[in-house]
Structures are given as C-alpha cells and as structure tokens.
Amino acid sequence: MKFSENWLRNHAPIQANRDVLVATLTAIGLEVENVAVLGEALDLILVARIVNVVPHPESDLLQICQVDVAQDTLLQIVCGASNVRPGLVVPLALLGAKIGALTIKSTTLRGIESNGMLCSAKELGLDTEASGLMELPEDAPIGTPLADYLALPDASIEIKLTPNRADCFSVRGIAFDVAAACASEVTPFHIDEIPAVSARTLPVELHAGANAPRYCGCVIEGIDPAAPTPVWMAERLRRSGIRPVSLLVDITQYVMLELGQPMHAFDVDTLRGPIGVRLSRNDEALKLLDGRTVVLDNDFLVVTDADQPIALAGLIGGWETRITDTTINVFLEAAHFAPAAIMGRGRKLGLHTDASHRFERGVDPALPPQAIAFATRLILELAGGKPGSLIHVQLPEYLPAPASILLRRTRIARLLGIVIDDAEVERILQALGMQVTTQAEGWRVVAPSRRFDIAIEEDLIEELVRIRGYEHLPTALPVGASHIAMPSETRLDMTSVRRQLIARELQETINYAFIDAELLRRWQLNTGQVMLMNPLSAELAVMRPRLLPGLVAALGRNIARQLERVRLFELGNVFTASDEAGAAPLETRHVAAAVCGDAFALQWGEQVRKVDFYDLKGDLESLAAASGAVLTFHSSAQPWGHPGRSADVWCDDMCIGWIGQLHPALTQTLEINVDVIAFELALEPLVRRALPRAHALSRFPFVRRDLACVVPEHVTWSELAITVRDVIGPLLRDVKLFDRYVGKGIEPGFKSLAIGLILQDDTRTLIDRDVDDIMTKVVMAIQQRHDVRIRS
C-alpha cells in the first residue's frame, strides 16, 4: 500500500515528524518498505506560462521560449523538450535555483542567452518515468511557488501489509492506527446527504446470496466529459502509485484509496436494466476493459445488465459499458463482495487489480453507501451533473455482524504481565474506532465493521499492546532451575534421520505444505483433500496429502536445470480429511525420497549404471536399521507406481508406505523424461525402537548353507524370507538373496533364486546333522507354501 504523507496527516492530525511517523508505522505492524521524499528543495521554482516559441537559429533540437512568471518582463529560456509549445504552463527554475547538484545560472546556448530552466517532473524528483516538460493545468496561478501549488514537500510512503490488515488498504484505515499510536484521533469524516435532482434510476437484483449481500449505486446525468482531474487529486493519486487517467476513473480510484471501497463507473446510456449480481454460467463470454474476451466457467461472480454479464464483480469492468471521453451520464457502483467469491478468480484469467486485491482480503461491508455519497459529491463539484437518488439493495441476513467482546482487566494483566490504566485502555480502543462500554469486570467492546481480524478477547489485548508499544512489556528471565531432557533411547530423533539420509548422498528439500490440486489429480490423489479457505494462490490451494508430488516436482525442476543425477529427500507433515464432521484434519509426519540418474557419482573406480529400485531400497533399509525396524515388502497396486517395480512397505503388520519406480505415464505428464525411483513412509513406525540391549558374541562357529531354487514368478523374495525365518527361528542369524536368474534352462513363468543362510547357536557348535535337519525343514516349507523346486 502506497500513500501520500500529507494525505495521511489530513486524516490523522499528529505532530510527529516524518522520521517518527515512519518508525511509528513499523512499530505498530505496518512495516514501511520505502519512503520517497518529494519536493524538499524547490526554492526559486515557480509556475510559469510559455508565451512564445521560435526555433533556435543554430540548432534543430532547441527552441527559444519567452516565459511569463508574473514579473515585469518575460524571461528568455532555451529549451530542448519535445513538448514545448506556446500556452503551456510549466515549472520554471529561476537563476540560483538548485536542481539536484545543478545550480541554475545564466548561460549561452549556441549564441542565445538563457536565463533559467524549464523543468520535467523527473528533474524535480516528482516522478521516475516522466519525459518532457511537466505540464501543469492551464488555470495554475502564474508566479506561484511550485511547492505551494503542489502541496509540497511531501513523501510517498509504501508499507507492507499482513493479510489480516485489509482495513489498512486505505489512507483512512491507516490513520486510525497512527492516530491511536500518537495519542490523537482521526479527523471526523461525514458526507451530507445529497438530494436527488434526476429521477433516473436502475432496478437492482441480487441473486448471489452471501457472495454479494449489499449493492449501492447512483445515476448522475449531464456531467462535463471534458472536466479535468484537479491537480490536488492527480498528485495524491501519483504519490499513491496510480497514474491519473480521466476525471471519472480518477474519482473512483481516489475514493478507493481514501476510504478503502473499490468502485466502478458504467456509462448509463449503455445499460438497459435491471442491474443484477449472480454467479456466471458455463461458457459465458465477456469482453473486458483490457480488450480481452474471456470465456467463464460457473465459478465467477458477475454484474449483469438485463441478465447479460457486463463486469466481473470485484475484478474488472466490461468493454461495452466502459466510460469514454464522451460519457455524460454515469452509473456509479459500490458493493460488498465476499472474499471467497473473488479469491483466486483473477489468477484464473491472469488478472490482478487493485479492486481484487482488496476484495480478496475483505472490505468493510458498511462502506458502499458512504463511498457512493463521497464519489457523487466529488463528481458534482468537479464535473457538474444532476444526481439521482441513492440505490441501496441488501440482504441483511448475509451481512457480517461486528463482534461484541467482553474485555476483562484481569485477562489483560494475566496475558501482558502489566496493569494498563482504564483511561488508557479506553483511549486506545476508541481511537481505533471501537465502541467501548464500561462494565464491572472490564469493558464491552464492539469492533468496527472494517476490522475482520478482531473476534476474541485476545485480539483486543493484542491491539492494546501493539498500539501502546511492545517495549512497555516487562522483561523477566526464566525463574527456576532449567531441566535438560535427555534424548529418549526408544526413539530415533529427526536429526539422526536427516544425518542417515544425508550420509546416503540424499539432499534435503523443504517444500510448501500446500500443493496444486491439478498436480494431485495427475497422481490420482484428488480424494479426501483438505482445501484452504484463503490460499496464497490457486496453485497452492490444497494441503498436501503426501510428500511425493511436491518432492518429485522439485526433482523435475532440478532436471530442467540440466542436473542429471538428483537425489532428494524431505521430512514433513501431510494432511488428510477427518472422517468426523467438523473435526480438524489428520496430520501425520512422513519421510520421502526421490532419485534419478546414475547410481554413483562419476568416478573411474565405479561402473556406470542407472539407479534402480534396489539402490533406494538399500537406502530405506539403512534408515530402518538405525531404529531396528523390520520392514517387509509386498507387491503394490498404487496407481502412480510402475507395475512390477514397486512395493508397499509393511512394518509390524501395518502398511506404512510405498517404494518403487514411478509409472511412466505419470512421469510423462510431469514432463520428466527419466526413470524416477521414490519412496514415502509414515515416519512414526520408523523412529520407534526397542530399548537397545547388548548381546554377547557367540563363542561357537556359524555355518553357511546355500539353496538354489526355482520359484514361480509371482512369489516375491520377501515371502520366501519370511517363511525361512518362521521355520528356523533364533538359530537363523541372516538370510540373503545373492543371485537371481531368468533365461535358458528356466521355464517361462519361473525364476531361479540363490539364497544364503547363516546359522549359529549361542550354546553349542552346530553339527552337520543339526544343519541338515534344519535345511530339510526349510525345503519342505518353501515347497509346500510356494511351489518351489530345489535345483541340484
């Protein structure tokens, strides 16, 4: 939000100088990002009129001007500006004036004496982009100091607003906070009722319920289309970052900046009536003010004329009903549109307007009648005309009601640790525009309709300390002995998880907890979504149900930047909708990884090959080994996984995640042209671990036996391993798959697996007969359960 310092002081009559004002704004939460000082050194610069212009005899680029500054004689000025012409009113720097580092002196240019300098706005520090001489209105008083005429010096102040302070998107909204912080009060603002002169009106129909509960308007006939924007208004707009366009448009912008209510003006002669507000219909088309024709879906709020769209409510007007240079009859609109009805619609069309910026965050629902009256008064004063009566249509049941809150003295003292005098509490709250009624235990406070962010007692206490100053809160060191908790040995902490994954050459990624609904649709994760009511953007409108979509998107961006070997992991929360109506979403911590490219960094001692399922499975198993979690892997049917190259991950008889190669169809839609291997698991089962116990090493030798078996293709290695462990029990120290073969000598539908078993007893040496008995049991079990044949 950018505004003029002088404009703010008109609403908040404070004595503080500019430096104190800037510091105060930041201290009360309205962070100042930039201050552009305007017109501090305009001595000896006057308003002048060019009386005569003749070409310079020695230069095609210079003109000789005779200039009137209300002195006895005309001044001769040599000028090279492209827009110099007789009758033009411009700023003139007299001899001795300073413009930046330049002091104006009498000089001779190509043999012609010049006794001053005609100035551009850029040279005077009043604009950053202007070219040519600064053109002033024809009625500007000649000989008047420019600083007096333009109400200078001034400053253009730009502040950064948090989303909850939509009320400060107006000069008057900011003034309430500044006045309260500086022990002052805002200047009263009242517009007298304007009597109707014209009988012309338009019927209004509201068909959008809570999306548009209030609509105000006024018809004004017979305005002067050639009336210029007065310099005081044009300068306030410029210093607020808005370029003047035409009087009617400038008045709507001016009212928006001063009061905070976006407005729109229609050429009433292009309207038939009735005016309506409704949701758009699929495939409705509308030509916008920027010249584009857009096709709408059924999710836009539109203003209609005879049920035909003429504007996108809260966004932008339509081409057919626009104000032109010949408009003499106008219909002013000021309405209250709900933030949810405007939010994200502009981004769908690539639009961002001052109106949508305000409506998305919330506009005072009580403002429309006041804004119409103010704009009507300005038009009558500056362009004449005959006003009609105020049109005011509303749906009271949908209008938000101001919060009425009990503020207790005891609660203030408990939260802040200090006692604030009753008089100070009442002064601050009343200066902020709140209605305050004294009660036995404190005050009954009604928040102003512009303050959507005030709903509970703590909000009021925050206002007190914000305006009074956080520096007045007591500073106290913690009392009592500090307690340093030892890390639990039954849990693997997050630092250890990160270190383990980093040791496996994975790099940590931190993504938003929000994600694009369209991306989830591609992953077939578009059920049970947790939608945000006020998203940062349309692309970040859903709380992520899994880490992988965002993580793989980050991997894709790295690939697009010519990185071939990418290894990423992320630790974060995921969100799913609760089965209970009205309950908070379920929040679970997950760990995920995604890799692509070569298995190893390029070096002479390693064979070059692509990373595969088993590489990432090894990374996952190393993480599980750190906590002692026992993982098993079963074939998966997840839609984003490659069939045959992905698995569900189980721990303690519960499916906790997925690992595998992404489905080629998915990577193609994500515009990733390499194989991506990934996993994602719930973190809680991985970080739980039993209390570590020490075991003595066996004094007796181990025995290794190998089995070569032919196994049906559908039988997985994990199923075989589980059977072997069940049969052997505690004597089995390890079981490994060390070879897999498919091809000549193995019939179709089968595979050959070579298994190594390590057997050991802690109490005695295993003899051949013991081992043979065990191996016989293993062979019988796998033959019966899995239709396995032993190879000789």
Swiss-Prot record:
Primary enzyme class: ligase
Residue intervals of the tRNA-binding domain:
39-147
EC number(s) of the enzyme? 6.1.1.20
S-S pairs: none
Q: Which UniProt keywords apply?
A: Aminoacyl-tRNA synthetase, ATP-binding, Cytoplasm, Ligase, Magnesium, Metal-binding, Nucleotide-binding, Protein biosynthesis, RNA-binding, tRNA-binding
Cofactor info, note text: Binds 2 magnesium ions per tetramer.
Ranges where the FDX-ACB domain occurs = 698-791
UniProt keyword Signal, yes or no:
no
Every B5 domain range: 400-475
Pfam families tied to this protein: B3_4, B5, FDX-ACB, tRNA_bind, tRNA_synthFbeta
One biological process term from GO is: phenylalanyl-tRNA aminoacylation
Q: What's the catalysed reaction? A: tRNA(Phe) + L-phenylalanine + ATP = L-phenylalanyl-tRNA(Phe) + AMP + diphosphate + H(+)
- A GO cellular-component term linked to this record: phenylalanine-tRNA ligase complex
Query: Keyword Kinase: yes or no?
Result: no
**Which Gene3D superfamilies does the record associate with it?**
3.30.56.10, Bira Bifunctional Protein, Domain 2 (3.30.930.10), Ferrodoxin-fold anticodon-binding domain (3.30.70.380), Nucleic acid-binding proteins (2.40.50.140), Phenylalanyl-trna Synthetase, Chain B, domain 3 (3.50.40.10)
What are the subcellular locations of this protein?
A: Cytoplasm
Record-linked CDD domains:
PheRS_beta_core, tRNA_bind_bactPheRS
Q: Please give the cofactor(s) recorded in the UniProt entry for this protein.
A: Mg(2+)
| Molecular function GO terms recorded | ATP binding; magnesium ion binding; phenylalanine-tRNA ligase activity; tRNA binding
- Residues binding Mg(2+) are D453, D459, E462, E463
**Family named by the database record:** Belongs to the phenylalanyl-tRNA synthetase beta subunit family. Type 1 subfamily.
Known NCBIfam families for this protein? Answer: pheT_bact, YtpR
Quaternary structure annotation from Swiss-Prot or TrEMBL = Tetramer of two alpha and two beta subunits.
Q: What is the protein's given name? A: Phenylalanine--tRNA ligase beta subunit
Q: Native species of this protein?
A: Xylella fastidiosa (strain Temecula1 / ATCC 700964)
